[in-house]
């Protein structure tokens, strides 16, 4: 008798697959728009195990505290300006419509008040390309190179997210990768379906290696592994499609 495959167990959401939320310091987002803005300072810089960049705890003059990604060069005790009158200096939280073209920013809001959506990974930044004051839009270039328009009333932090270069350091040991996966609730290591027994996976079993065949989209959960709903796979498929376009 077959068993539920791993992807079904993960979808059920057992405790071993859930992210350890009790280890998190809190959501990284800007304070609500109704909060009086002005000046603040960096209380501490934290290591957030669920993220790939250090996080700064910022306290405003009115006592409101929030978490934001730390910019490169940010230090504890540094004064931070927040709001309309903030200067475009590293670490300050500014309004996008008042930022000069060519400024590097991160944790950019797509809509005013959403807390930040773009350029949040370690070592990344977006660049302000232009302004459309008549439409209340700001044009920015994302780390991927894509150019998008966002709300000019939205907020962003000037600078580059700290933690750049983290992917340049190799893991060297499987144990290091294990601990990283555990901190982020990733499944590690990943076992190939071909290496399993037939009761554990549709690709399992057999005394010699064999590949799975494409599964129809109408197949029930548990059968959908590998390619499903595909008409053609592999390099030959790419060439065939290219010839069809000619």
Swiss-Prot record:
InterPro entries, alphabetically?
A: NA-bd_OB-fold, Rib_uL2_dom2, Ribosomal_uL2, Ribosomal_uL2_arc_euk, Ribosomal_uL2_C, Ribosomal_uL2_dom3, Ribosomal_uL2_RNA-bd_dom, Translation_prot_SH3-like_sf
- A GO CC annotation given for this chain: cytosolic large ribosomal subunit
Give GO MF terms, alphabetically: rRNA binding; structural constituent of ribosome
* A Pfam family reported for this protein in Swiss-Prot or TrEMBL: Ribosomal_L2
Keywords tagged on the record: Ribonucleoprotein, Ribosomal protein, RNA-binding, rRNA-binding
Concerning SMART domains, the annotation shows:
Ribosomal_L2, Ribosomal_L2_C
* GO biological process annotation, one example: cytoplasmic translation
Disordered: where is this region? 197-226
Q: What does this protein do?
A: One of the primary rRNA binding proteins. Required for association of the 30S and 50S subunits to form the 70S ribosome, for tRNA binding and peptide bond formation. It has been suggested to have peptidyltransferase activity; this is somewhat controversial. Makes several contacts with the 16S rRNA in the 70S ribosome.
Relate the assembly described in the record: Part of the 50S ribosomal subunit. Forms a bridge to the 30S subunit in the 70S ribosome.
Q: Which family does it belong to?
A: Belongs to the universal ribosomal protein uL2 family.
Q: Which HAMAP family does this one have?
A: Ribosomal_uL2_A (MF_01320_A)
In Swiss-Prot or TrEMBL terms, this protein is called Large ribosomal subunit protein uL2
Q: Which organism is it from?
A: Pyrobaculum islandicum (strain DSM 4184 / JCM 9189 / GEO3)
- What is this organism's lineage? Archaea, Thermoproteota, Thermoprotei, Thermoproteales, Thermoproteaceae
């Amino acid at each position: 008798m077959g068993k539920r495959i791993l992807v079904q167990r993960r979808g059920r959401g057992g405790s071993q697959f859930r992210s350890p939320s009790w280890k998190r310091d809190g959501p990284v987002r800007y304070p609500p728009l109704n909060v009086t803005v002005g000046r603040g300072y960096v209380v501490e810089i934290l290591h957030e195990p669920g993220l790939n960049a250090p996080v700064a705890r910022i306290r405003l003059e009115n006592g409101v505290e929030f978490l934001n990604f730390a910019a490169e060069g940010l230090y504890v005790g540094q004064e931070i300006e927040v709001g309309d009158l903030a200067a475009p200096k590293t670490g300050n939280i500014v309004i996008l419509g008042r930022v000069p073209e060519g400024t590097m920013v991160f944790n950019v809001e797509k809509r005013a008040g959403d807390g930040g959506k773009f350029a949040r990974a370690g070592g990344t930044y977006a660049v302000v390309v232009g302004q459309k004051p008549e439409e209340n839009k700001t044009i920015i270039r994302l780390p991927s190179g894509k150019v998008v328009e966002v709300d000019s009333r939205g907020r962003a932090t000037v600078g580059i997210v700290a933690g750049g270069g983290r992917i340049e350091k190799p893991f060297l040991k499987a144990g290091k990768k294990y601990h990283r996966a555990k901190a982020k609730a990733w499944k590690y290591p990943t076992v190939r379906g071909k290496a399993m027994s037939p009761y554990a996976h549709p690709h399992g079993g057999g005394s010699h290696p064999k590949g799975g065949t494409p599964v129809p989209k109408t197949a029930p959960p548990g059968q959908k592994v590998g390619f499903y709903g595909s008409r053609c796979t592999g390099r030959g498929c790419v060439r065939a499609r290219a010839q069809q376009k000619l």
